[in-house]
Amino acid sequence: MFSNQYIQQRIHKANSLREEGKNPYKNGLKRSLTNAAFLEKYAYVKDLEEPKDKEKCESIVGRVKLLRLMGKACFIKIEDESAILQAYVSQNELNDEFKSLKKHLEVGDIVLVKGFPFATKTGELSVHALEFHILSKTIVPLPEKFHGLSDIELRYRQRYLDLIVNPGVKDVFKKRSLIVSSVRKFFEMEGFLEVETPMMHPIPGGANARPFITYHNALEVERYLRIAPELYLKRLIVGGFEAVFEINRNFRNEGMDHSHNPEFTMIEFYWAYHTYEDLIELSKRLFDYLLKTLNLDSKIIYNDMEVDFNQTSVISYLDALETIGGISRGILEKEDRLLAYLLEQGVKVEPNLTYGKLLAEAFDHFVEHKLINPTFVTQYPIEISPLARRNDSNPNIADRFELFIAGKEIANGFSELNDPLDQLERFKNQVAEKEKGDEEAQYMDEDYVWALAHGMPPTAGQGIGIDRLVMLLTGAKSIKDVILFPAMRPVKNDFNVESGE
């Protein structure tokens, strides 16, 4: 694993430190300031002639990003999470330590420098070292600065290296953290209670998706990694909670692309005595809050598309197919005509699709990618909405919406189905679809129906994909860019890469 000649040279240097009685992985030394705090505290030191006060001693730590040896002195660029700070080490102050430094120190090593602030001839605020310690000897060379780490596969597989070499990557994940905490704060301010529900389910439910299957040794039963928390959250509404939310992982054993990862983060929230129209207004408030928190304008650019949050619209499913998709009502309202139209347009249609699923195929192909500004699409076909409430005026549609931004689904919400008999029938229909070969159809969940039979108040519920939300608000083009360790196809590891030195 460590046979590479450059790695062997570094291992030799680590062993050489040990021979000098120095631990190359020293512990217990503390910094007094972050690099950013040092730069702020001593910003007034701007001139080489500034009096040097050795009493103002600080300890800073970080990774060596640049090393310039110049005879009896050296300059070292040291990076911690907050900033890059320059250290100056001279043989005059550190005779033996300086000789050891010249012999052993390399780019990538993690160090501690204790010293006082001073400015170089060029006016750069730096640390004049009085003590120097290697805290962690790096035995694998980092990619050279000029070429960086551009191999996209390697960036995802070795995210730690990506974070070291590409500073902008840290910024994305700091923004992700801010987005998640802001979403949580928003719902707490709106009076919602954060809860946690099981990650392993006896019956997969809450979404149409293939589950991952595992085995519980103690119970001697199969369990499914959850595809959605919906049915458990609605059980809590039955139990008397009126506004709950959960931010956590879902797992779907399906394909991967730039906007899908089998393990992903969602927020789902349920609101008793409210309707899907209330959720639309709540969603608008959420985005207003996020844009303000992130200091973003109401117009953002994503994938070369201008998204204007001041141009939010609401449109029904059939109206969207007609006015945006360009399909006439005469075709949309007749199942045989719609099927013929899809085939004429070259859409690959699975055999025996229901009318509702044909409409969904048409929507996916002719509408979704055109929805750039925030668009709430309402009145979905009941056949593709097995958990949503049936509309009072038209039993063929559901009181449901999906929110699309920049051509992608961001949220799905509806007035919840709380009629246990209707829910039982719909589960039976889903089971029939599964028996016909639809692997994504939902399972029968009698326990959930039994819970509904105890009475669930009128409720609205919604899910928002956190990863896609982060993509939108950071401009990331791939979901892998906003997940620290995304799912990757297995490869044979070859760690003996050539050094960039």
Curated annotation (Swiss-Prot):
Gene Ontology CC: cytosol
Localization: Cytoplasm
Gene Ontology terms: biological process: lysyl-tRNA aminoacylation
Catalytic activity entry: tRNA(Lys) + L-lysine + ATP = L-lysyl-tRNA(Lys) + AMP + diphosphate
Alphabetical list of Pfam families matching this protein: tRNA-synt_2, tRNA_anti-codon
Molecular function GO terms recorded: ATP binding; lysine-tRNA ligase activity; magnesium ion binding; tRNA binding
Binding site for Mg(2+) 1: E402, E409
Claim: ATP-binding is one of the keywords in the record: yes
Domain of life: Bacteria
Alphabetic keyword roster: Aminoacyl-tRNA synthetase, ATP-binding, Cytoplasm, Ligase, Magnesium, Metal-binding, Nucleotide-binding, Protein biosynthesis
Cofactor(s) listed in the protein's UniProt record: Mg(2+)
Signal sequence annotation: none
Positions that bind Mg(2+) 2: E409
The enzyme's E.C. designation: 6.1.1.6
NCBIfam families: lysS_bact, PRK00484.1
Assigned protein family: Belongs to the class-II aminoacyl-tRNA synthetase family.
Subunit and partners: Homodimer.
Protein name per its UniProtKB record: Lysine--tRNA ligase
Record organism: Helicobacter pylori (strain G27)
Lineage, uppermost ranks: Bacteria, Pseudomonadati, Campylobacterota, Epsilonproteobacteria, Campylobacterales
Gene coding for it: lysS
